[in-house]
Design a protein with these regions (language model features):
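Glycine-rich phosphate-binding loops of nucleotide-dependent enzymes
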Residues: 2-246
Length: 246
């Protein structure tokens, strides 16, 4: 693991009216590290990742990326710098195939008889390459995503992030609504990301998954950071106590 954080959150606060959604939160993420972000509903997890990814702007504090202070105007600017977010709904188009989803909004074009048309062959070929890097096997790249399992859909979302050279991947409840076998596949994918040097922020209510995949755990409660530890140095009982304030 690198000694230099790829992402630093420094004393970040965010208010919505009179509500402190985040209050003086700091944390670091290193390349090739899986950092779990734990907390109950309303703890501030979603607000924090939206500040990092450019959806919200912090009222106070700083975000540093590769050592430089950054302010992302919107999520697209964050993606252009290599920060990708996979939300629980995956933001995939069920009626499109794998290649079209990997290139969604960034479709390559070619000219046929002087007219611009989608280069579907390139999209499918490069999508296959991206999934192959993660050892993901999908037999039919020409089928719409609605025909695929939840685990395969999650894999396509991860493959899309890797294809666009993500250096930081934020994953919001990636194993929610999946069966146990598919949860295991997603955990294996996250471990593959770690091996490739991607820094992963892993948001989950599932402590079993957190302990299976993370290197460190940060716990939020009511907008404040109340705990941070190496995963191997704690247990689920301690994490739950931090979450509920016991």
């Amino acid at each position: 693991m690198s000694e230099q954080p790829i992402l630093q959150v420094e004393s970040v606060s965010k208010r919505f009216g009179g509500v402190h959604a985040l209050e003086n939160v700091s944390m670091d993420l290193f390349p090739g590290e899986v950092l779990a972000l734990a907390g109950d509903n309303g703890a501030g997890k979603s607000t924090l990742i939206k500040v990092i990814s450019g959806v919200h702007h912090a009222d106070e504090g700083k975000i540093r990326y590769n050592g430089a202070e950054v302010t992302f105007e919107n999520p697209q600017k964050a993606r252009e710098q290599g920060i990708e977010t996979i939300y629980q709904d995956l933001a995939l188009a069920d009626n499109l195939d794998v290649g079209a989803n990997v290139f969604l909004g960034r479709e390559p074009m070619k000219r046929v008889f002087g007219l611009p048309v989608l280069d579907r062959k390139k999209m499918r070929s490069e999508a296959a390459d991206a999934l192959r890097v993660l050892d993901i096997r999908i037999n039919r790249f020409d089928l719409p995503l609605r025909s695929m399992s939840g685990g395969q859909r999650q894999a396509v979302a991860i493959g899309r992030a890797i294809h666009w050279n993500a250096k930081v991947l934020i994953m919001d409840e990636p194993t929610a609504a999946l069966g146990v076998p598919e949860q295991r596949k997603v955990i294996a994918l996250i471990k593959s990301l770690k091996q490739s040097g991607v820094g992963v922020i892993f948001i989950s209510h599932n402590l079993i998954d957190i302990f299976a995949v993370s290197d460190r755990i940060v716990v939020l409660r009511r907008g404040k950071k109340v705990g941070e530890t190496a995963t191997q140095a704690t247990n689920s009982d301690e994490v739950v106590r931090w979450m509920v304030g016991g």
